[in-house]
């Protein structure tokens, strides 16, 4: 088989690949490439005391209204299961784990890119710049990681950047990180409701 016949065409989100080994077609690849990268960034940011202070402050509404957030979370989970059933998506333990992963990645990405990095950027080498530039840079990195770890197309990464800016704006207005995480979870599910399982995923 020659190189051209072995190549994989682009999917809805992912770029084409001349080498099938580079194409992300398994849940495990998403978990290792993207989940691990974003987790390391998020947990690394939480080593800074200034981030921990901001984190606990941003969760005040969650701690004060934990029952409400629990109900909203359960409602979102039920909606996701109903969505999968209505659109004839496969519903099994693997899919449930995927939904859980989407919640996890929403948590670590919001802690890392909406909360932590703008603070760290503006508190360190960007002191002479506006805090908004820290938000811009953080979301630029956020979109860039999707380009490299998930092999997303440039157009999808641009929308990811704009979506990140929107979430940053919502976080700036509400100062409620739990709310932003739930919004992120819902949007991410609608964008990628099922885990990759073959080379035709997302096409």
Residue ranges of each PLM-predicted region?
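Short, Lys/Arg-rich, polar N-terminal cytosolic tail immediately upstream
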Residues: 2-31
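Juxtamembrane helix-loop-helix connectors linking adjacent transmembrane helices
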Residues: 20-111, 118-129, 133, 200-203
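Transmembrane helix-loop-helix hairpins at the membrane interface
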Residues: 91-203
């Amino acid at each position: 088989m020659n190189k051209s016949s072995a190549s994989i065409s682009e999917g809805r989100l992912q770029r084409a690949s001349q080498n099938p080994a580079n194409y992300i077609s398994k849940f495990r690849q998403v978990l290792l490439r993207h989940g691990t990268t974003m987790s390391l960034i998020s947990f690394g940011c939480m080593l800074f005391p200034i981030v921990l202070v901001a984190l606990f402050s941003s969760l005040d509404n969650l701690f004060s209204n934990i029952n409400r957030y629990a109900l909203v979370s359960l409602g979102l989970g039920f909606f996701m299961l109903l969505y999968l059933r209505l659109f004839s998506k496969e519903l099994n333990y693997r899919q449930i784990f995927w939904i859980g992963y989407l919640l996890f990645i929403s948590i670590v990405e919001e802690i890392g890119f909406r909360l932590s990095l703008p603070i760290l950027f503006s508190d360190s080498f960007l002191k002479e710049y506006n805090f908004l530039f820290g938000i811009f840079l953080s979301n630029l990195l956020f979109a860039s990681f999707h380009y490299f770890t998930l092999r997303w197309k440039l157009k999808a990464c641009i929308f990811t950047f704009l979506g990140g800016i929107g979430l940053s704006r919502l976080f700036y207005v509400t100062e409620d990180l739990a709310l932003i995480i739930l919004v992120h979870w819902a949007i991410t599910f609608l964008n990628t409701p099922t885990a990759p399982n073959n080379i035709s995923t997302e096409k």
